[in-house]
Structures are given as C-alpha cells and as structure tokens.
Curated annotation (Swiss-Prot):
Molecular-function annotations in GO: NADH dehydrogenase (ubiquinone) activity; quinone binding
E.C. number: 7.1.1.-
Superkingdom: Eukaryota
Species in which this protein is naturally found: Olimarabidopsis pumila
Stated name of the protein: NAD(P)H-quinone oxidoreductase subunit 5, chloroplastic
Swiss-Prot/TrEMBL GO biological process terms: ATP synthesis coupled electron transport; electron transport coupled proton transport
Family: Belongs to the complex I subunit 5 family.
Amino acid sequence: MEHTYQYSWIIPFIPLPVPILLGVGLLLFPTATKNLRRMWTFLSIFLLSIVMIFSLYLSIQQIFLSCIHQNVWSWTINNEFSFEFGYFIDPLTSIMSILITTVGILVLIYSDNYMSHDQGYLRFFAYMGFFNTSMLGLVTSSNLIQVYFFWELVGMCSYLLIGFWFTRPIAANACQKAFVTNRVGDFGLLLGILGLYWITGSFEFQDLFEIFKNLILNNRVNLLFLTLCAFLLFVGPIAKSAQFPLHVWLPDAMEGPTPISALIHAATMVAAGIFLVARLLPLFIVIPSIMYIISLIGIITVLLGATLALAQKDIKRGLAYSTMSQLGYMMLALGMGSYRSALFHLITHAYSKALLFLGSGSIIHSMEAIVGYSPDKSQNMILMGGLTKHVPITKTAFLIGTLSLCGIPPLACFWSKDEILNDSLLFSPIFAIIACSTAGLTAFYMFRIYLLTFEGHLNTFFLNYSGKKSSSFYSLSLWGKEEEKKLNKNFGLVPLLTMNNTKRASFFCNKTYKISNNVRNQIFITVENFGLNTKTFYYPHESDNTILFPMLILLLFTLFIGAIGIPFNQEGIDFDILSKLFTPSINLLHKNSQNFVDWYEFLRNATFSVSIAFFGIFIAYCLYKPFYSSLLNLTLLNSFQKMNSKRIRWEKLINFVYNWSYNRGYIDAFFKTSLIESIRRLAKQTNFFDKRIIDGITNGVGITSFFVGEVTKYIGGSRISSYLFLYLSYVLIFLMILLFFYFEKF
C-alpha cells in the first residue's frame, strides 16, 4: 500500500497530456489533429478512468485501514525560508477525487455527441482536460500555496468554459462577471493565507492546524486578528461556491455549454469552495464566531436561492438557483460542525444535479429542432410541455433527479438532506424553521420545472393562446408575470394559453378548453404560423445513445449512492461506509460518532421532512398542472375563487414573488447601482483629472517653455550680440534679486 501512495502525486497530471497534445497538434498539425478528433475524446475518457480506478483503490484502503498519507518535498530558497510542496491523501481527498472523475467521465461521454457539430469541439475537450487537472490538483494539495495555485487555475478554466461561445455578447459578459466576482473572493483568500502565515509561520495543513490550536489554547495571539484572517479565508469559498452575497455570477454561468454547467455545478468549481471549508474546518472550529458566520451565510443562501428559483423560465437558470440553495445547505452543515452531513450532501447532490443538467441538455437538444438555436427559446420552459411522449427516457431520468432533490426516499438526496435538517434542529430553532421551509420550496420549484417541461402538450403548437392583462393567477403560474403591453399579433411563440374570446384569462376560471385533435395528430410543425420562418420541423425526439448512457449511469448513482451513508446500527449490520471513511470525523452536534440515530427517531424525522416535500409537490401540482387538463383540480381553484376579499392581496403577494425572482432579488441591481456605476463615475472623474490636470500641468510647462523660447528668439532678432545682451540682462536681474534677499536678512 505504501508503494501505491508514493505514486499518488501523479493523480493531477494524468489528464494533462490531452490539453498539451491538443495545443501542440493544433499548432503544428492542425488538419491531422482535427481529423482524429474522436481519438482525443477516447484518450480523455481513458486517462480520467485511470484516475478514477486509482482513487477507488485509495478509498478502499482508507476504509479498512483509516490512514492518512502526506509526502512533501522541500525547496529551500534561503536559510530563513523554504517552500514545501507535495500531496496529501486522506478520506476527503479520496471522496473528491472519485466525485470529480466519475462525473467528469460521464460528462466527457455526453459531450462527445452534444458538442459534435460545434467548431470548437477540440478546444472544448482541451479546456475540460485542464479543468479536471486543476480540480484534482486542488484536492490533493498539501498546503495553502498549492491550494491557491490550483484554485486560480480552476477559476481560469471556468472563465474559459463559461465564455466558450465568446462571440455571443451575453456569454462574454457572463464569463467576465464570473471572473471579476471570483477575483473578489480570491483576493480575500490570498490575504487570509498571508495572515495565517504571519501568525503560524507555516503553509502546511497538518502543521497549521496544530500551531493554530496551540496559539488559541495558550492565548498567545490576538483573537480579533485571527478571526479576521479566518474570515478572509472564508471569503474565497463564498465566491467560488456562490454564497450570498457573491453568488451573482452563478446564474449567468449558464451561458456556457450544458455539459460545462453539469460539471461546474456538480463536481468542480462550486464544489471547490465546499471542499476548502471542509479542509480548513479544524482551523475554523476553534473560532466560534467564524462557525456562526459560516452557518449564517449558509442559511441565507439556502433561502435566497430557493426564492429566486420560484419563477424562473429558463430551465438551466432554475437549476442554477437550485444549486445555489443546495450549496447553502452544505455550508450550513459545515457551520454547524456537521462535517459528515455536509460531505454526504455534497456527494448525493453532485450526482443528482449532474443528472438534472444532462437531462436539461437533452431537452434543449430536442427543442432546438423546433424553436431554433437561440437559448431564449430552446431553454424557455414556457415553450416546452408535453415532452413525456417524445423523450420518455429523458423524462424518467429527469423525474428521478427531481424527486431526489425534493428529498423523496429512497433516493440519494433524501438521506443527506434529512441529516442536515435534523442537525439544524439541534443547532438553532430559527435556522431549522428556515431550512425546513426551504425544503418545501425546493420541492415546489423543482416539480414546477418538471411539470412545465414534460406535462400537458407541446406549447409551441398553440396559436393565439396567451395570458392577457388581468388579475390572473394563472398567468403567473406559467409565465411568472402578467404582460403589461399589448402583444404583437405577428409574433406567435409568445402567446401560450389565452382564450378565443374577449374574456380575461384567469387561473380561477372553472372552464376547461379542449385542444383540437388536429394539433395532437400533426406530424410536422409549421413555424410559418408563428411568424419566425417558413421551414418545417419534426416533433422533439429522444437524444442519441451517447447522451442517454451517461444519464442512465447517473440515474443509478442517484438511486443507490445514498446507501453509503444510511445510519444502520443493528447488530451484525454495519453498512455505514461514509462514517467508516470519516472516522474519526468532526461533528459538534453528535459528540459520539458511533451512536447512530435509532430507527424510531429516524422514521419520525424522515416522516416530517418527506411530508414537507410532498406538500411542496402538491402545491406545484395544483398550480402548474396544464390548464386544459381534465385532471385539473377545479375544486381547489373554486375555493380560491370564493375568497374574493383576499384575492387582490394574494395576487400582490404573487407579483412580488415573481418580481423578486425575475429581478434576482434586486441584488444585481444593487451592485450595478452602488458599485459598477460608482466605479464608472470615479473612472470618468479620474480620467478627467489625469487628462486635464496632470497632463495639463506637464503640457503647460512644455508649451510655456516653447513660447518663452519663441519670444526670446523674436526679441533677439537672430543676432549673437542680442542673445549675449539678453543673457547678461537675465544674469544681472538674478544677481540683483539674490543680493536683495541677502541684505534683507541683515
């Protein structure tokens, strides 16, 4: 086994040959490299598979032997300072390596088909290989300097991949936004690292934790400065894991290709922040104020992400806010000291969210044949609906991922989220109420996404169907907002579900409208009627096998990965692999890690959390079941209809919810007004001061000297005697002034 650990340093560098060879090949042999492009995909998958097998072997060794291995090489710069670099293998490293490689392999297989028609196919796989290398280097780092180096590489790769289609202005702005926002966090992280080195004199994790703990226990350091350094360290993960208030880059990151969205949201960039907090938790845990700040940021992000996802129309953006909320759960768990629960949820959420993003990519892929290649249309859930019969495999996979994220047993996220909810009850009643309420919101907005996408009929079929200006709850249900302006009659993709008469379209109407059988039985969809073009397209179709295969594998992970953390405590049954891997683990809420929850308490807590999830699903089903469906709950709608006195107040609340979600909680607007506009005004004033004042002084001196010379030249008349006379006159005047001041002193 020791022999195996000696070669662990090679883990980050195994995927690296692909981007290097691709770069050299495209530079020296561009035609041959492009012709053999499928070979590069196979090589990328093969190399990442080697890393996965290696990581699995290390994890198995750690489960049975519970060992930590560190190997460090020292680079002496002078007698007083030496830089040490190496690798650190522990259970956290093994879990993250398995997560990165398994999700990465499936995303690479998926991308081979998804990006097959893109001109940047080889560039995409070069970026992906470098992304995997950077993330593997981050999780195997043995000190903070190495962490920061690979941390920056992860940020650079995300910048390149988010802006992969850089010719689109929206994508270019999105990658710049991600880059600038993460620079704020990275600057804080760098300051925190330097501050810790000033205090402890070491960058190594093992030495750092021991020295830090001794300084706290012996009261040999300024606690305020120590807290400041720890908080600055935490600023980096706030930005990288899209925590409030540095979360603003995450929704815009959806402008990159869908496989990148899956990788960023599941196993790489956003997971990097959670990983770093987990790695530094022995340091944070001795400062109670920092632990409370971590949990506070986490619970704010949990609620904010869920509320912002409520009325999103873009399927990828809705999933992005869902990721933000789930990352908040992980950060909350770490802030509560529940190390095991946080990492358990990181694992289960990664596979579930990767499944959902790859499923959304399959949906977008099928919709592009109908509405075109504009993300505003192909990703718009309002133009979807009725995809169940067209993409049944994608629908099944997406439904499993949705149910998992909702917390429905026995799927993956149920086990991990239930642990976090239970731990929040022990930590703070207020935090527990928010966390449980958000669990219901999660079920609501996830099933909203599912119902709008798969239930009913394909909404691009309908002509002259739209919610008009009215106090309509229904117009919010699908659109999220009532239209204030009149619709253009020539534009037919916007209208969705309006009536053919002059009556207002209301969600509270108890009349159903039957859809023409001619529409259902159409073989082709003519987009001519929608005012777009005269081409004819097919129905949505199921994706190819290379897209479906990764989704099915992720579906199996979503079904069974939760088993690694099921808390069995019966005699003769000990399947809790996760606790074995994290023995001894950090947990402030359960001091005795071997004392698992008994089945009665577990079932009681699980029943409560599942009830909340089912309540959210029920509300989503009632509000978002297709308006023309015979299964629509008209009794419920009539009960709302009778509450005429409260209806206006209720609709104002709904419009507020929509505006809050649509405007991203007004946080982007606040940053734009308070920061961006202020910086622009300051830049303009600085530019004015530089050009008019600074340059004016220097240019003024030059111009003055020029004119003085010209005047002197004119007076002198170009005669040497005149120049000599002027020179002597200047000297005489200078001497007179000097003598005047000299005699003035006496």
